[in-house]
Amino acid sequence: MTEHYFTGKPSTKSEEQTWTFHLRDKEFHFTADSGVFSKNTVDFGSRLLIETFEMPEGVTGDLLDMGCGYGPIGISLAATFPEQTIEMVDVNQRALDLAKRNAKANRISNVRIFLSSIYENITKGKRYAAIVTNPPIRAGKQVVHQILSEAYDYLAINGTLTTVIQKKQGAPSAEKKMKEVFGNVEVVTKDKGYWIIRSIKE
């Protein structure tokens, strides 16, 4: 079975690639590698999430990038919202090492990047203003829904959970789960089969 990116220590041979990408009118330099998600470019789903994300107004707290990979979402949002601290977590150590290097390469200092299998290493009692995730679809529906449902406990009141999922990979199911957990859900936009879905903790 081919190893997927929801793996603590990928065994696939390292084949790093570096490229430049524009996100939210800013230029970024990213290095990615085999054994991490979307190693050749910033994937369309992440780009759509980055471009459509809005920080909730009047909510105090950091932002969490759950399943950050090599860091395009967290790093670009850290550049967009320099007054915010962005915490970026992943289960994949190779991805985390790349995320740290990419933050440094782009001179981003308002980030904390650390290992966590889903919310395992998140500070107990911490409440975020927003959680964003391009979830690890290949890890299976149970993992994806765990990420979405447990987000509720880590959000401040009026904080938001925003995710991107393709329709064919379970967006309608994710929408239903978020409605069930939060009592509200909005499909912010749909583009090329990708849905941006948002819920608010009320």
Please give the residue ranges for each predicted region:
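A short glycine-rich, Lys/Arg-flanked "PGG" loop and its adjoining helix->strand segment in the class I
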Residues: 145-157
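Conserved class I S-adenosyl-L-methionine
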Residues: 166-183
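Conserved beta-strand signature within the Rossmann-like core of class I S-adenosyl-L-methionine
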Residues: 158-165
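N-terminal auxiliary segments of SAM/dcSAM-dependent transferases
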Residues: 1-24, 34-38
